[in-house]
From Swiss-Prot:
Gene encoding the protein: sthA
Source organism of this protein record: Pseudomonas paraeruginosa (strain DSM 24068 / PA7) (Pseudomonas aeruginosa (strain PA7))
One Gene Ontology term, aspect cellular component: cytosol
Binding site for FAD: 35-44
Name by which UniProt lists this protein: Soluble pyridine nucleotide transhydrogenase
Subcellular location: Cytoplasm
SUPFAM superfamilies with a match to the protein in the record: FAD/NAD(P)-binding domain, FAD/NAD-linked reductases, dimerisation (C-terminal) domain
Amino acid sequence: MAVYNYDVVILGTGPAGEGAAMNASKYGRKLAVVDSRRVVGGNCTHLGTIPSKALRHSVKQIIEFNTNPMFRQIGEPRWFSFPDVLKSADRVISKQVASRTGYYARNRIDMFTGTASFVDERTVEVVTPSGAVERLVADQFVIATGSRPYRPSDINFNHPRVYDSDTILSLSHTPRRLIIYGAGVIGCEYASIFSGLGVLVDLIDTRDQLLSFLDDEISDALSYHLRNNNVLIRHNEEYERVEGLDNGVILHLKSGKKIKADALLWCNGRTGNTDKLGLENVGIKVNSRGQVEVDENYRTSVSNIFAAGDVIGWPSLASAAYDQGRSAAGNIVESDSWRFVNDVPTGIYTIPEISSIGKNESELTAAKIPYEVGKAFFKGMARAQISNEPVGMLKILFHRETLEILGVHCFGDQASEIVHIGQAIMNQPGELNTLKYFVNTTFNYPTMAEAYRVAAFDGLNRLF
């Protein structure tokens, strides 16, 4: 058995693993990463963020071609199959893998392929695809193995008509009707993607409101636009059982309803990839969803083992995972690059997309904070009119007395880009976080960023 010695070993090469590896390598640590795939990137690159967002972009282009009258001079509206659209995602994945492989190579980071499990607090064994066993000994470890779709034991995911958010990327046909169970972020994003391809979608929500953590107005707007695109949303429903057929699937709900479709996409929760790590050998416990508990330093119950990314739960975003991994490594190398990641904007890539940061109206009302609202509707913005993207708005919540910005909520094209301007101002200390910044700053014209100025004036006009 080959034995290798390192300062730090990182399990996983997704955003959290990459963030940890790059930061630790900058401080001269001898590093190795372990991944079950022969290529880097983790589930984010191969099954999650990258393919789903590439799919969304392609579908958005199809919608633009089919609905913009200008394109009728070129030809009639076209129908595209899901497998054809998926090819664009494959190209993006290949480019991402090439880029990220270069990061590891330039930083002289050793890579091992296989399944890693802890032998003790200083040792992991890696079983390679060929069955060989290699042993890695290190002073510090970072668990960044990510997550996978949660699969209830009473649902047969081996049935050819039953998919989860990983296996849906192997769908070889375009269903006429699709049931999506679970109306969280992933469920809503795929509802947008498939409905944009003309698929009739039944979106089953176990709660009474879509994405209830959002501002109510934004959640309502999402519901409206999904319904406007022929998505049937069923709230407060839970499954009784799933019946697989040769030509489809029937979803039996506890309410007594039965829904038949060509396929079922299960999007109800995720579980941490911890079951094969041998955590019991080092005394690390996980919760019912396989997630590892960490402190504010991203340290587990074992002092030399850290964890970051989806494997620790909230917020389960690629952006946060990278910073969490970087912060975990910052603690290992005792640098000032550490911070607890809690200032995280929400980015939801539905059609139209959604992004927000800070408090929403319900939270501010419950806290009895005197706030006011400023809005800018995209239909009145010159840039949105030029790009033919009139749907959406920017909403700024601010303190009536101090003008401190308390929350920014955006719905529409480029929402996930627009929100960062508000985030930057909200992070300024003291009186520098003020609505006045937007009225005293000259924005390029025409731009979507100008919506901040419009919303700020709208909010100030409400004061008396």
